[in-house]
Swiss-Prot record:
<feature type="transmembrane region" description="Helical">
    <location>
        <begin position="467"/>
        <end position="487"/>
    </location>
</feature>
<dbReference type="GO" id="GO:0072657">
    <property type="term" value="P:protein localization to membrane"/>
</dbReference>
<keyword id="KW-0967">Endosome</keyword>
<dbReference type="GO" id="GO:0005815">
    <property type="term" value="C:microtubule organizing center"/>
</dbReference>
<feature type="topological domain" description="Lumenal">
    <location>
        <begin position="544"/>
        <end position="554"/>
    </location>
</feature>
<dbReference type="GO" id="GO:0010008">
    <property type="term" value="C:endosome membrane"/>
</dbReference>
<feature type="topological domain" description="Lumenal">
    <location>
        <begin position="613"/>
        <end position="631"/>
    </location>
</feature>
<keyword id="KW-0963">Cytoplasm</keyword>
<feature type="transmembrane region" description="Helical">
    <location>
        <begin position="555"/>
        <end position="575"/>
    </location>
</feature>
<feature type="topological domain" description="Lumenal">
    <location>
        <begin position="396"/>
        <end position="398"/>
    </location>
</feature>
<feature type="topological domain" description="Cytoplasmic">
    <location>
        <begin position="488"/>
        <end position="522"/>
    </location>
</feature>
<feature type="transmembrane region" description="Helical">
    <location>
        <begin position="592"/>
        <end position="612"/>
    </location>
</feature>
<dbReference type="GO" id="GO:0005794">
    <property type="term" value="C:Golgi apparatus"/>
</dbReference>
<dbReference type="InterPro" id="IPR004240">
    <property type="entry name" value="EMP70"/>
</dbReference>
<feature type="topological domain" description="Cytoplasmic">
    <location>
        <begin position="653"/>
        <end position="663"/>
    </location>
</feature>
<dbReference type="GO" id="GO:0006672">
    <property type="term" value="P:ceramide metabolic process"/>
</dbReference>
<feature type="topological domain" description="Cytoplasmic">
    <location>
        <begin position="322"/>
        <end position="374"/>
    </location>
</feature>
Length: 663
């Protein structure tokens, strides 16, 4: 078992993202978290069986989560496999975020007693008769899962049981999961975890990990309270073809299942457990050893800081150019008003009579602005709370639950913003406006989500959202979000239309012939480059956490990148808006929204590149699911960035035309 493993992709466990984000602190810094007690989570004390009490437990429960694979987007519940099942035990209640993430935590048949070591204990035995259709189906499902490298996820004391091994660069990697088994191809090639044992050599054969050696580390409480706290749980998967099924000794050749096997196949599942005191690891920093060991998530701090510095430098340049140029323009225009050449206006001042002319499709633009405002505020508040530590990473699903609840409650600003701008655009169909704000963008997302859910239902995946949860989501949408949107729209329409600093002429001004660079499409395409440049590094790690099963724990950096993205979208849009106004093109409303919103197109292109260059996903259903969920993210990002660009340009245009003298 000493052979070094190549880096195996950690299991798909997006929820672990929520459990690990904050443990390195709220802001960028050294990788070690320094240790602190998590909000909303009290440590559990354990002690020997004879000393147990209400304040000190002796029994250690092991829970199992869904199984998933790096080669498939389809996770399955533990009970979908023919493993040993718990005879009793209550399934932990799940919050909305956990259900949406597809988390399925269940009790397991593995029960331990603190400080009581056990060796080669039999859990259960599974017997398969290959001539029976039902047994053959179960066995084939098990084989397919091993072929796709499906992985277990076990939980002890609300933290993952990890499998730690050496990787190619000589470092130690701790995987928050372990595979069901592995496969030797008909050409003798060892896939995935089959490289750990030289005895795995039979061609066209599966080897199932039917035994685990578990070691639980604890830290004795130094304060007045009694007992110890668990700080780590590690395991090593093994395979044994037990000679005596009823009295296994955990020795001998590995448990092989040939593709050509026939007759009766018996698999005995066993485990050994031991305990060890660790005086170095504290309960509050017990996640450090997992986060610090992950080879794929070692962040190149210099690379990220370099990108941030470049973006800040470019943003500073844009700001300086805008301030200096505008200052000179405004001074020149105001001086000209007192001279004989006052009538010879030029540049952006020429279009003052058309700058606030209502845009085409003002209804749709106002609806997008309302939904974008909802997403913008939701993102800011969620990231801010996460950085402060209010969303406990040990409270599984807390981040997703917070985001959904915020989105539902932020229907009021969405309706208000949509109504205010629609009224300022001269719109009168207020009922249509509020209905579209309530249902258009959320409806598109829900329709996409529902189609993806139908595919998951058809595949029998545990990620399929239960019907009751879908009803609950619809209830939140229709019974809370929609009424709040109507309330916001009521106040938005009740207020007077936004007052502009200059009057709009009755006859539209003719726009002169534009150069290539000032035409709409080139400007929109160029406008998204700079914002995308400031997020693509973080985007890589976020996509890794979602699709390549890696933990993402840099909320501090993510919040900084969020702020820089807002600044960059604003300044890039303002800069291009200024150039277009100087070219006497006053159609800035849609252009400003699409300029920064085009960042979402680069996001989509990057997601396609990521799929083909980084992922190992196979199968039509998994491919459809990947791009289906990607389109939801792209739409949300489009509304988010587009709204930032519009508001920045609206503020800019209002500001510059309010400080110049117009006859």
């Amino acid at each position: 078992m000493s052979a070094r493993l190549p880096v195996l992709s950690p299991p798909r466990w997006p929820r672990l993202l929520l459990l690990s984000l904050l443990l390195l602190g709220a802001v960028p810094g050294p990788r070690r978290s320094g240790g602190f007690y998590l909000p909303g989570l009290a440590p559990v004390n354990f002690c020997d069986e004879e000393k147990k009490s209400d304040e000190c437990k002796a029994e250690i429960e092991l829970f199992v989560n869904r199984l998933d694979s790096v080669e498939s987007v389809l996770p399955y519940e533990y009970t979908a496999f023919d493993f040993c099942q718990a005879s009793e035990g209550k399934r932990p209640s799940e919050n909305l975020g956990q259900v949406l993430f597809g988390e399925r935590i269940e009790p397991s048949p593995y029960k331990f007693t603190f400080n009581k070591e056990e060796t080669c204990k039999l859990v259960c035995t599974k017997t398969y008769h290959t001539e029976k259709a039902e047994d053959k189906q179960k066995l084939e499902f098990l084989k397919k899962s091993m072929l796709l490298n499906y992985q277990h996820h076990w939980i002890v004391d609300n933290m993952p049981v990890t499998w730690c091994y050496d990787v190619e660069d000589g470092q130690r990697f701790c995987n928050p999961g372990f595979p069901i088994g592995c496969y030797i191809t008909d050409k003798g090639h060892a896939k995935d975890a089959c490289v750990i044992n030289s005895e795995f050599h039979e061609r066209d054969t599966f080897y199932i990990f039917n035994h685990v050696d578990i070691k639980i580390y604890y830290h004795v409480v130094e304060t007045g309270s009694m007992g110890a706290r668990l700080v780590a749980a590690k395991l090593e998967p093994k395979s044994f073809k037990h000679t005596h099924i009823d009295k296994p000794d955990c020795s001998g050749p590995p448990m092989d299942i040939s593709n050509k096997a026939s007759g009766e196949i018996k698999i005995a599942y066993t485990y050994s457990v031991s305990f060890e005191e660790d005086k170095k690891i504290r309960w509050a920093s017990r996640w450090d050893y997992i986060l610090e060991s992950m080879p794929h998530t070692h962040i190149q701090w210099f690379s990220i800081m370099n990108s941030l510095v470049i973006v800040l430098f470019l943003s500073g340049m844009v700001a300086m150019i805008m301030l200096r140029t505008l200052h000179k323009d405004i001074a020149r225009y105001n001086q000209m008003d007192s001279t004989e050449d006052a009538q010879e206006e030029f540049g952006w001042k020429l279009v003052h009579g058309d700058i606030f002319r209502p845009p085409r499709k003002g209804m749709l633009l106002s609806v997008f602005l309302g939904s974008g405002t909802q997403i913008l505020i939701m993102t800011f508040v969620t990231l801010f709370f996460a950085c402060l530590g209010f969303l406990s990473p040990a409270n599984r699903g807390a981040l997703m639950t917070c985001a959904v609840v915020l989105w539902v409650l932020l229907g009021t600003p969405a309706g208000y913003v949509a109504a205010r701008f629609y009224k300022s655009f001269g719109g009168e169909k207020w009922k249509t406006n509020v209905l579209l704000t309530s249902f258009l963008c959320p409806g598109i997302v829900f329709a996409d989500f529902f189609i993806m859910n139908l595919i998951l239902w058809g595949e029998g995946s545990s990620a399929a959202i239960p019907f009751g949860t879908l009803v609950a989501i619809l209830a939140l949408w229709f019974c809370i979000s929609v009424p709040l949107t109507f309330i916001g729209a009521y106040f938005g329409f009740k207020k007077n239309a936004i007052e502009h600093p200059v009057r709009t002429n009755q006859i539209p001004r003719q726009i002169p012939e534009q150069s290539f660079y000032t035409k709409p499409l080139p400007g929109i395409i160029m406008g998204g480059i700079l914002p995308f440049g400031c997020i693509f590094i973080q985007l890589f790690f976020i996509l890794n956490s979602i699709w390549s099963h890696q933990m993402y724990y840099m909320f501090g950096f993510l919040f900084l990148v969020f702020i820089i993205l807002v600044i960059t979208c604003s300044e890039a849009t303002i800069l291009l808006c200024y150039f277009h106004l100087c070219a006497e093109d006053y159609h800035w409303q849609w252009r400003s929204f699409l300029t920064s919103g085009f960042t979402a197109v680069y996001f989509l292109i990057y997601a396609v590149h990521y799929f083909f260059s980084k992922l190992q996903i196979t199968g039509t259903a998994s491919t459809i699911l990947y791009f289906g969920y990607t389109m939801i993210m792209v739409l949300i990002f489009f509304l988010f960035t587009g709204t930032i660009g519009f508001f920045a340009c609206f503020w800019f245009v209002t500001k510059i035309y309010s400080v110049v003298k117009v006859d």
